[in-house]
Amino acid sequence: MYKKYLIASSFLAAMLLGAVTIPNILYDPWWYFNGNILDQVNPYFNERETKINLFLKSPQKYDCLILGSSRVTFLAARYINGYSCFNMAVSASVGQVGELYYFGRYFNKYSSVPKLLIVGVEEFNFQGPPSTNIPEFVRQLKKPPPWYSRYISLEAIEFTHKVANKNSKSRKSPRVYNQNFEAVFNTNKRLSIDKQVKVIAENIEGCNYLKPIRLGKNFSPDNIKYYKKLIAEFPSARTIGFVPPISVDRLFEIYLLGTLEGYLNNIYETAELFDVFFDFSLPSTITNDGDLTYDGSHFSSATYEKIGKILTKKAGAEVLAVDIKSMGYEQYKQLILMRLESQEFISEYHKRCERIIGI
C-alpha cells in the first residue's frame, strides 16, 4: 500500500513539476536555451542576467565585446565584420558607466582572448554618480544560478506569462528581441518623435529658439575614469568608442539649456581614451529623421547597420558622424555649433515646434 502511495505521489509531483517547468523552457524568459521558440518574440526583463545566460552558452567563440545602454542593443553583432562579437549592452539608468567594467571583466574571464572592444558613450553617463546595478554573481565572476533552479520558481511563471501574453506591457514595449536575440523595433507600438519636441517646448517655455536661455543640469567629467578603468581590462584589444545617435531635438535641448560646452568637453576627453571614436549625435540625415526612431533615443537596426560599417571601415563617416580623433576640440565644437545654429535648421525646427504644440 505504502509503495503504491509513494509511486502515485512521485508521479503527481513529476506531473506538477513538468506543468511548471515545460512552459518556462518553451518561452525561456531568462534565455538559458533558445528564447521564446513559440512565436520568436523575446521581451527584455533583466538583461543584466539574461545576456549573461546567453553569453555562457558558448563563451569561447567570442573575441569581441559590445557595451552600452539600451540604445546600443540595436548594434547587432553581425554588423561588425571580421569578429565574433557579443552585444552585452543593457537598459540603463543614469550612471550606467559604473557597470561597464564589471561586465568587461566577466567577459574576459569566460571568453577567448578579446581582440575588439566597442563602447557606446552616452550623455547621461556624465550626469550622475556611477551605478552598479549588476548581479552579484557578475561582481564575483561566478556562474549564474542553473536553469532548473530558476524555472521551478513562481517568479519564472510570472515572467513566462508576460512573454506568452501578447497584450502584456512587456510584449507591447517598443523594443524587443527577435529569435536571434537582436534588438528590433516592435511594430505593435511606435511612439511619436513629436512627443520629445513637445517636452522640450514645455521645458523652455515656447518655440522661439535663437540662443541658450537657461542653464540646465551640467555634465561632469567625474565618470570618465570608469571608461579608463574598463579599457585597462583590454590591453591587447583594439578599442572603438562612439556616441550613439540621438534625435537632433535632444541635442538641441542640450544646446538651449546652455550645457553643450560641458557635453562636448566630456565626449572629447573620453574619446582620447579609445583607438577610434565617432560621434553620431551631431545633426545629420539620421538624427533629423523621425521615422528612424521611436522616441528620439533609440534608432532602428538599419541605422545601426550603417554605424557598424563606419566603426570598422570608416565608410560614410563624413556625413553621418564626426571622427573626433582626427580633429582638435575647437574644430569639433565649431562643427557641431555650425549645424545647430544654421538658419535652415532653426527655421525648420521652429515651424515644427509650433505645429506640434498648437501655436
PLM features per residue range, with description:
Residues I7-I25:
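Hydrophobic membrane-insertion alpha-helices, especially the h-region
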Residues L26-T50:
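Alpha-helical transmembrane signal-anchor/signal-peptide segments
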Residues N42-I66:
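Short extracytoplasmic
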Residues K61, I66-I152:
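Membrane-embedded segments
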Residues V97-G104, K217-Y227, L257-T270:
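Well-ordered, non-membrane alpha-helical segments in soluble/globular domains
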Residues V121, P130, I134-A237, S326-I359:
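Secreted/periplasmic serine-hydrolase-like ester/acetyl group-modifying domain
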Residues I231-Y255:
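Active-site segments of SGNH/GDSL-like serine hydrolases
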Residues L251, N265-I359:
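C-terminal regions of proteins
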